[in-house]
A protein has these predicted regions:
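Catalytic histidine-centered segment of alpha/beta-hydrolase-like enzymes
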Residues: 300-311
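An N-terminal hydrophobic leader/cap segment in hydrolases
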Residues: 15-89
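Conserved alpha/beta-hydrolase
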Residues: 126-148
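Conserved alpha/beta-hydrolase "acid-adjacent" motif
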Residues: 273-279
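Hydrolase active-site cap/lid region
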Residues: 192-249, 256
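Alpha/beta-hydrolase fold nucleophile elbow
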Residues: 173-184
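Alpha/beta-hydrolase active-site loop
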Residues: 152-173
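Short beta-strand/loop motif that positions the catalytic acidic residue
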Residues: 259-261, 266-268, 272
């Protein structure tokens, strides 16, 4: 107490006057507000703060399209429950859980879901692949569903999890061909996995929907849309992710896609406000593979292309996977 009194008494009077003016004018409150707001946004967006958050339930029950997707997906899953096997891998001490729908083929599609989504979300996207003769793997990403983990790392750690799942399919189920189907963050994870030297050659292709250049651009577009883009807020949110996960929002698929060598199908909406069309075109142009196709949809919200135009979506997917039919006689 004496030390504190000595400290306060040693502070010149003019310093107290300046501090009083700053507090009274609210200038000091702005940075405090930014710090609090950035942590709130980060925790709401990329941190699992309770076991119930991001569980195996619809993420947007108030949205009719989301609920229609969920309903159709659940119908498909229930109709094929006899083909389902519960699967589990561990990577870096994190338990990861999924469901493998084995229809007797030696090839499988792995659905890489977006932020907030569990394996239940993947059912809806599995339908055209199952119709085309592929087994299906849907998984709870880390920090989602039944899987362990606290943070969504926007594809970075998830990409290493994806590689672990591919090795599981190869070693435990005899799968010889894998295709990634990634939505938003899942698309980023697919690109990171496929440009990682440790990725098995079993992965033969990549389908993306709503792929962004880096998560930072998507985050800024979200903040602008919701009128929450306060000056200085984004750098603090970016700092939260760096502090908690060691990864940067400013690094993304646009930095590595030139190393992509497998066939690529990009599905993208001209109305996407988060993963904007100009960046989608740039990602496509930069992709290193010569076997690539970009299919534009005139309408469709972010991650909502299949429910908006199911026939066109499924046709594009089936044409893409058709090229693998002669490579493996199944």
């Amino acid at each position: 107490m004496d030390t504190l009194l000595q400290f306060f008494s040693s502070v010149p009077t003019f310093v107290w006057i300046i501090l009083g003016v700053l507090v009274g004018s609210g200038i000091l409150m702005y940075p405090i507000t930014l710090i609090v707001a950035s942590n709130m946004v980060y925790n709401a967006t990329l941190r699992r703060t309770s076991p119930e958050k991001w569980g195996r339930v619809p993420s947007f029950p108030e949205d009719p399209d989301s609920m229609k997707m969920d309903g159709l997906g659940m119908e498909w899953a229930e109709a094929h429950r006899d083909a389902m096997k519960e699967v589990h891998v561990v990577r870096d001490g994190v338990n990861l859980y999924g469901e493998y729908y084995d229809f007797g083929h030696k090839r499988a599609v792995m659905i890489l879901s977006g932020r907030t989504e569990s394996l239940r979300y993947g059912y809806f996207f599995a339908i055209p692949y199952a119709e085309a003769g592929w087994n299906i793997l849907v998984v709870d990403p880390r920090a989602h569903g039944k899987s362990d983990g606290e943070f969504n790392t926007v594809g970075f750690e998830e990409s290493l999890d994806d590689i672990a799942w591919v090795k599981h399919l190869r070693d435990c189920h005899g799968v010889r061909q894998v295709i990634f189907h990634g939505i938003c963050i899942g698309a980023a994870g697919g690109v990171y996995a496929l440009t990682n030297p440790d990725c098995p050659e079993t992965v033969k292709g990549l389908v993306t929907e709503g792929m962004y250049p880096n998560f930072g651009e998507s985050m800024k577009n979200h903040l602008i849309e919701r009128k929450k883009m306060m000056w200085g807020l984004y750098p603090l949110i970016r700092g939260c992710m760096r502090r908690h996960t060691g990864h940067s929002m400013d690094y993304g698929p646009i930095d590595v896609i030139h190393r992509l060598e497998v066939p690529l199908l990009m599905l993208h909406s001209k109305e996407d406000p988060y993963s904007t069309p100009p960046y989608a075109q740039k990602l496509f142009d930069l992709a290193g593979t010569s076997d690539k196709r970009l299919v534009w949809f005139e309408r469709g919200r972010h991650s909502m292309l299949r429910i908006t135009d199911t026939e066109r979506y499924d046709t594009a997917v089936k044409e893409f996977v058709g090229q693998f039919d002669t490579a493996l006689h199944i």
